[in-house]
Amino acid sequence: MADNTTLTDNEQVKLDIINAVLIKKIKTGQAARILGITSRQVQRLKKEVKREGAQGVVHKLKGKISNNHIDPSVKEKVLQKIRTRYYDFKPGFATEKLKEEYDDRNQFIIPTSQTVRMWMNESGLWKTHKQKKAEYRSWRPRKEYYGELEQFDGSYHYWFENRYKDKSSGLIEVCLLLSVDDATGKITHAEFADNEGVVAVFTFWKSYVTINGKPIAVYLDRYSTYKINHKSAVDNYDLMTQFERAMKDIAIHLITAHSAQAKGRIERLFGTLQDRLVKEMRLAGINTPMEGNQFLKEIFIPKFNNQFSVVPAQTGDTHRSLTSDDKKNFNRTFSIQSKRKVNNDFTIQFKNNWYQLKEVQPTTVRPRETVLIEEWLDGTIHITLKGFELVSMLLPERPKKIKANPVILTTHELNWEPPADHPWRRYGNR
């Protein structure tokens, strides 16, 4: 009876070798070496070929449905869900969301991300891109302790897509300020803000150190032209000067990077967030920065850290508690500070406003002396000299010049008369 079994090239070679063993042309050991199998497997194949002919070298599962076979209806359901709900998701992220949505309901088993990627490629929902050859840069090992180094940056993006618009229906680009711990990869703090200016950054770090304590160091870039000239930027030109001073005041070491690649971890994280966070907020119906900040704190960051953070090389938290001096000067530390000269009439001009210093002050003030103007985050203005806060009042308009002015302001009124027991009287100056 003719054997009409169709064999592959490898199966045909295997059959020829086994037949050579059967007619004693070669020995079993030689056949095992040629085929790359054991002598015991050759003996089994000899029995199979004697009993079944050419079919004996064919794998018994050939042509049968795999135990891991996925029903075509499941494939169609998955692709339909991706088309309607997860149309712009990457395969891995789409698989995660499908598992969250369907695995708990036991409706059908969600395949692996590799299978979903293959299906999306076949249906045109995803196109695998070739990796570009990257410029060589040496790898920097992670810090060993949690809190040893915080990478900080901001990213302008349409985080709320077409759900957050201005009065003219234009899309609003929002800045996400974010810090990530270098040792663990955890997002330690994140806030949506209008811009990456001094007020927004100070508000961020004031909240950070209140919640977490003071890290040993903060790593950030010297701001690019794009960020400084961004349409939403307010006071970015002054940011580095103010931020360096504030970090020095509370003993946090500031490290500046001179390229985006130097802060690779946080740059890659922003790329991930511009994909994942945007879509998570879309699914959750988050439409404004206020809703987004609550979503970050309560849902997204805990879930993200649980999924993507790593175990640090050393256990322990190197964040430091705020000292009593830190707490005492907290508002002053996180204030925008500027220097101004005292005019001859003891007025001070600042941002189109005029302030009159009152006659009695906690320290002596002379004309042309330099004072420090502090703009606190609550919007109030404080004028200080030699560590003392001066007493002042906001004038309704620019003061008119007057002829007579007091020479100095002191801790008492200028027409003050010394008492009888004052040392000045005792030495004959009566």
Where are these regions (language model features)?
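C-terminal, beta-rich DNA-binding module of retroviral/retroelements integrases
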Residues: 301-430
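Mobile-element integrase/transposase regions
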Residues: 104, 118-187, 194, 198-216, ...
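Short, amphipathic alpha-helical "recognition" segments used to contact nucleic acids or chromatin
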Residues: 9-26, 75-85
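Short, Lys/Arg-enriched anionic-surface-contact patches
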Residues: 1-15, 65-73
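Acidic/histidine-rich, metal-coordinating catalytic segments
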Residues: 209-235, 258-260
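Charged alpha-helix within mobile-element recombinases
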Residues: 236, 242-313, 318-331
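Basic, flexible linker segments flanking DNA-binding modules
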Residues: 54-159, 238, 317-325
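Short alpha-helical "recognition helix" segments of helix-turn-helix
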Residues: 29-35, 94
